């Protein structure tokens, strides 16, 4: 029987609360789907919690455990008590973790966990119904990692955006793999600013080369990022498929997309360090896209669905358990369809109520 080693970072504020519900899901799979194997969970501190205890947002011990693991599950990090002016900040731990694990591809799905949530969207139901795409953001290159010059009092500052062909090729291959795994294969949308930026022109050329030569059966379309941002509001279904873009553009467009499903608490993410083809280890960091929510943490009202769906992504991409991943997603849909909703969705269910409802539906599905 397989044993899956998972490092768990509860993180700060509401992070541990939502992780508890995600772990309930893993325990249910162990019990009700024995062929999935065992989940060996190792708890470590990250972010502010680690600063408070170790004066370090990510210790060497925690980092080494994450490197050796099959996957990493994270709640959320950060909070006002650690400030933004401090030399040691919670976010430094997550950035270091991403860098050391080489997680170059960030995946954020944009869809409705349940059709009943369409009316929760700020967009009209007839506009957003049927939206289903995944943003694949290059995570370890671009302007966030380029040379910068801080303002030294002269009133001048500078950031540079470097990209190499190799960096673009590997994120294009990841997007191509994900698109090809869909049934039927999904369309690939590549977002850039090739009418202005040199890096975008290299991006467009490289993505075209990779998709046309390595994934000839896929349909590829290029879209300027500003046009795509407008399309996302006007007709988000037009981007259905796999959306690939650079670090900066992906950061912005994925946050814009996160508004569509109606609550940031619903949305999962995965940061991968390889192609999840089942042929070798593909470690990843799995976390909800929401922050640590210090204003509502400890009240039992945080929505754990984003974290639970992050577990589904972990099962699919790092642990090669697609049946169980599908079951978790179906259980979330069933729980919401049956009326279990947290406060952010207009309901009264607690964090624990939501987790328990998903587990109850999951048990039915796995035993069927």
Swiss-Prot record:
One of its GO terms (cellular component) is cytosol. Mg(2+) binds at residues 226, 251, 255. The record marks 144, 193 as: Important for catalysis. Its cofactor is Mg(2+); Mn(2+). Belongs to the isocitrate and isopropylmalate dehydrogenases family. The keyword Chloroplast does not apply. It comes from the Eukaryota. It is found in: Cytoplasm. Pfam families: Iso_dh (PF00180). Its main location: cytoplasm. It catalyses: (2R,3S)-3-isopropylmalate + NAD(+) = 4-methyl-2-oxopentanoate + CO2 + NADH. GO terms for molecular function: 3-isopropylmalate dehydrogenase activity; magnesium ion binding; NAD binding. Substrate binds at residues 98, 108, 137, 226. The keyword Transferase does not apply. NAD(+) binds at residues 79-91, 291-303. GO terms for biological process: glyoxylate cycle; L-leucine biosynthetic process. Its EC number is 1.1.1.85. Keywords: Amino-acid biosynthesis, Branched-chain amino acid biosynthesis, Cytoplasm, Leucine biosynthesis, Magnesium, Manganese, Metal-binding, NAD, Oxidoreductase. InterPro entries: IsoCit/isopropylmalate_DH_CS, IsoPropMal-DH-like_dom, Isopropylmalate_DH. Transmembrane segments: none annotated. Pathway: Amino-acid biosynthesis; L-leucine biosynthesis; L-leucine from 3-methyl-2-oxobutanoate: step 3/4. It is an enzyme of class 1 (oxidoreductase). This is 3-isopropylmalate dehydrogenase.
């Amino acid at each position: 029987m397989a044993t899956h080693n998972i490092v768990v970072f509860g993180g700060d504020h509401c992070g541990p609360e939502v992780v508890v519900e995600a772990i309930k899901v893993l325990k249910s799979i162990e019990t009700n789907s024995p062929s999935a194997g065992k989940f060996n969970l190792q708890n470590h501190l990250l972010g502010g919690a680690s600063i408070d205890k170790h004066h370090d947002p990510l210790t060497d011990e925690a980092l080494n455990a994450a490197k050796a693991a099959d996957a990493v599950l994270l709640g959320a990090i950060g909070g006002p008590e650690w400030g933004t002016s401090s030399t040691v900040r919670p976010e430094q731990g997550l950035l270091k973790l991403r860098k050391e694990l080489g997680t170059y591809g960030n995946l954020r799905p944009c869809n409705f966990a349940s059709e009943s949530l369409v009316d929760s969207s700020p967009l009209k139901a007839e506009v957003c119904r049927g939206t289903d795409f995944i943003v694949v953001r290059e995570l370890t290159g671009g302007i966030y990692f380029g040379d910068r010059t801080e303002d030294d009092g002269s009133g001048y500052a500078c950031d540079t955006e470097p990209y190499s062909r190799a960096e673009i090729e590997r994120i294009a291959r990841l997007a191509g793999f994900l698109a090809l795994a869909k049934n039927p294969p999904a369309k690939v949308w590549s977002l850039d600013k090739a009418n202005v930026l040199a890096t975008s022109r290299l991006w467009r050329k490289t993505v075209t080369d990779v998709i046309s030569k390595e994934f000839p059966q896929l349909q590829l379309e290029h879209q300027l990022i500003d046009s795509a941002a407008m399309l996302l509001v006007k007709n988000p279904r037009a981007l259905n498929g796999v959306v690939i873009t650079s670090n900066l553009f992906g950061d912005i467009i994925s946050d814009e997309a996160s508004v569509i499903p109606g609550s940031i608490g619903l949305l999962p993410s995965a940061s991968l360090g390889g192609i999840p083809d089942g042929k070798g280890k593909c470690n990843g960091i799995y976390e909800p896209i929401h922050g640590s929510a210090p204003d509502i943490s400890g009240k039992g009202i945080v929505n754990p669905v984003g974290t639970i769906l992050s577990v589904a992504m972990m099962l699919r991409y790092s642990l090669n358990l697609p049946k169980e991943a599908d079951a978790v997603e179906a259980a979330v849909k069933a729980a919401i369809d049956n009326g279990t909703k947290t406060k952010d969705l207009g309901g009264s269910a607690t964090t624990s109520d939501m987790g328990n409802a998903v587990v109850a539906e999951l048990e039915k599905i796995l035993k069927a």
